Amino acid sequence: MNDIIKKIQNQIQNNPIIIYMKGSPDAPSCGFSAQAVHAISSCGKKFAYIDVLKNPDIRLELPKYANWPTFPQLWVNGELIGGCNIILELFQKGELKKTISICDKLNS
């Protein structure tokens, strides 16, 4: 296993909610990342992020590791939730907040 995969695994394991995105939550660099961050932020939970534009090694390796080709990618409790479309669908159904709230139950 290469060092980048280990780094990704460590990030996912050490952050109950993490999004791999283009840009930052305050300054997204693409519309999909902006929409995803807005939905996640609306749930009222803190989350970590990794800017894949500033981390080209992660941008290259994460799609292979996750078997998910695009960004953003939302991970909750070590599980890939999905990209922008799935995040927005869960948000619109009211299920994103429930999914993210699982972190409270598992970490208490």
From Swiss-Prot:
Keywords: 2Fe-2S, Cytoplasm, Iron, Iron-sulfur, Metal-binding, Redox-active center. Residues 5-107 form the Glutaredoxin domain. Disulfide bonds: none annotated. The keyword Acyltransferase does not apply. CDD domains: GRX_PICOT_like. Gene3D superfamilies: Glutaredoxin. It is found in: Cytoplasm. One of its GO terms (cellular component) is cytoplasm. Pfam families: Glutaredoxin (PF00462). [2Fe-2S] cluster binds at C30. Glutathione binds at K22, R59, F71, C84, N85. InterPro entries: Glutaredoxin, GRX_PICOT-like, Monothiol_GRX, Monothiol_GRX-rel, Thioredoxin-like_sf. SUPFAM superfamilies: Thioredoxin-like. PROSITE patterns: GLUTAREDOXIN_2. One of its GO terms (molecular function) is metal ion binding. Belongs to the glutaredoxin family. Monothiol subfamily. Homodimer. Monothiol glutaredoxin involved in the biogenesis of iron-sulfur clusters. PANTHER family: GLUTAREDOXIN FAMILY MEMBER, MONOTHIOL GLUTAREDOXIN-S14, CHLOROPLASTIC. This is Glutaredoxin 4. It comes from Buchnera aphidicola subsp. Baizongia pistaciae (strain Bp). The lineage of its organism: Bacteria, Pseudomonadati, Pseudomonadota, Gammaproteobacteria, Enterobacterales. The gene is grxD.
